[in-house]
Amino acid sequence: MATKLQDGNTPCLAATPSEPRPTVLVFDSGVGGLSVYDEIRHLLPDLHYIYAFDNVAFPYGEKSEEFIVERVVAIVTAVQERYPLALAVVACNTASTVSLPALREKFDFPVVGVVPAIKPAARLTANGIVGLLATRGTVKRSYTHELIARFANECQIEMLGSAEMVELAEAKLHGEDVSLDALKRILRPWLRMKEPPDTVVLGCTHFPLLQEELLQVLPEGTRLVDSGAAIARRTAWLLEHEAPDAKSADANIAFCMAMTPEAEQLLPVLQRYGFETLEKLAVLG
C-alpha cells in the first residue's frame, strides 16, 4: 500500500484497518524521541502510536521555559483533538523538566516524562565518577541538580552540555555520517581526565542514537545509561492501571509542525519505525 505525505487536511488514505488499540503519543522537539518510542514499542508492540516532533522550534535546549511549556501544551492539545489519547510520553529531557506539571493539570490521561538516569548510573559506577551528557538547558536546570543531590550525592558528577550532539544525531537519521573527530572535541574535557567517568548518562533522548559512535570515542568499558527501558515499563503500568479507554484502529502516524524538505526526507526513517504517514499538524498559538 502506498504511503503518502499529507498536509493535515487530506484523509489518511494509507491507514490500515485493524482492531482498536490504545493510542499513545510520543513527543519530542526532534527525532531523538524515536529512541524512547523504540523501547516502548519493543515492550508494547500492539498499540496505536503517534509520533510528533516540533521541527519549527527545534532544538528546545536553547529556548526559555515559558516558551517550552506553552509550545508543548499547544502541540499535545492539537494531537488530542485529532486522536483521543490514552497516554502521552514527553520524550525530551528539556521539555519534561519544565512542562509536566502543566500537562498533568490540563489533561486527564497519564503523562510520562523523561529525566536523566542519574539514579541507576550512581548504582552502576565502579570508580564513583559519573558523566552526564545532555543539552546545556538540562545541565543548567535546578531539577537536574536536585536529582544529583538526591540520588548521586556520593558520586563525582562530571557534566557536559552540548547542542552540537543533538544536531549530529539528527544528521545521522538523515543518513549523514557522524564525525568521530567532532565527538572527540565535544568529549575532550572527559578524555583529558586522569580518571574519566566509567558510567555516562545519556541525558538527551537524541544521544542513544549516537551510542555506537560514542563507544568508539569513550574509554573502553565505559557504560552508557539512558531512561528508555524504564519509561517503557512505566508506560505499560500506567496503561494497565490508570489510562482512559482511548483507542483507535488507524495506522500509526507521525506529525511534524512544518512540512519542510528536511521533514519529508525523514519519511523513510519514520517508516522503518512503523509510521506509515507523515502529516503536518495544525497548532494554535
Swiss-Prot record:
It is an enzyme of class 5 (isomerase). It catalyses: L-glutamate = D-glutamate. The keyword Electron transport does not apply. Its EC number is 5.1.1.3. Substrate binds at residues 28-29, 60-61, 93-94, 205-206. Pathway: Cell wall biogenesis; peptidoglycan biosynthesis. Disulfide bonds: none annotated. It holds the Pfam family Asp_Glu_race. The active site is at 92 (proton donor/acceptor), 204 (proton donor/acceptor). Keywords: Cell shape, Cell wall biogenesis/degradation, Isomerase, Peptidoglycan synthesis. The keyword Transport does not apply. One of its GO terms (biological process) is cell wall organization. GO terms for molecular function: glutamate racemase activity. NCBIfam families: glut_race, PRK00865.1-1. Provides the (R)-glutamate required for cell wall biosynthesis. Belongs to the aspartate/glutamate racemases family. This is Glutamate racemase.
